[in-house]
């Protein structure tokens, strides 16, 4: 019985141990390849896209290198161009399935590129999911119906071109930032957690914000008609609402709002909700 129990514990320990991926370092011989792809409306890049737990490792090792970037342009047809070290290119796996473009590495190989840049084009873009090693930059104006943006594990999403969509969902977690400088939407839902930031400019009819775990939502320059928001765990929300705001703050958090909105507020745990000047 004792032998069987020891064998069982050994098996469990083996199953939960992290698996080391093969590691390949770039050779500084940078090449650019054009890749033929079907049209896509979603982008997913990062260690989670490769089927490995983020807690073990990133398959692209950032090291001391600059951020790796996915640059996107809305256009008439789908295209993809990858710039990377020549010896690493054979390990890159590009797939479009159910209109989702995913970029991973063959057999979970961990790559350490000298340079890694992706430029993509498609007719529409409805979902962006960046994790760990990759940042996303919008190169052109973007329009459509629905847009969902997810940034995790230190990835950044930067949209400095106009974005015009009906519904927008934004989520930044684990030290990630999302910046949208010119957003026009009917409904916006924004969530920041784990030391992440949202920085938003533009206008929306209705919104929901949630900030937790030392995160900030900086949106004085995104004007809403109505907003429901909550801040907790040392987080701050800055917003501008014209008609109605329902806000709660707890655990040393603050909500600052501008505008002439009617308010329904609640605070606890050394938190404040402050109406600022218009």
Regions found by a protein language model. Give the residues of each.
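Intrinsically disordered, low-complexity terminal regions
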Residues: 2-278
